């Protein structure tokens, strides 16, 4: 997963900011395992060839599909990095 982020990457996870590969990976590894059920996905290119994405859906914790949490995520994919594109900015909000 490290190749999806660079030291320029930022993640806002429910209002808390994490900057750089190390901090972002540590946060993601500390969260409970979930299944993401994507309900909507929109994307468009930006003026500098980044990709702006918006996703909404359900998070299912511990296999409890009857009690999903709703999430919204907006992120920018930037050309570069070892994977070709990387998460430049990512905002995740869980409702």
Regions found by a protein language model. Name each.
Residues 1-2, 77:
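Hydrophobic pocket/interface hotspot
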Residues 2-49:
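A solvent-exposed, acidic/Ser-Thr-rich amphipathic alpha-helical stretch
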Residues 29, 42, 59, 73-75, ...:
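Generic alpha-helical propensity signal that fires on short helical segments
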């Amino acid at each position: 997963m490290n190749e999806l982020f660079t030291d320029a990457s930022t993640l806002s996870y429910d209002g808390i900011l994490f900057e750089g590969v190390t901090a972002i990976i540590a946060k993601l590894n500390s969260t409970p395992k979930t299944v993401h059920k994507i309900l909507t996905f929109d994307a468009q290119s930006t003026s500098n060839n980044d990709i702006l994405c918006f996703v909404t859906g359900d998070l299912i914790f511990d296999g409890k599909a009857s009690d999903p949490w709703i999430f919204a995520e907006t992120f920018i994919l930037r050309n570069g990095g070892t994977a070709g594109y990387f998460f430049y900015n990512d905002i995740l909000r869980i409702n």
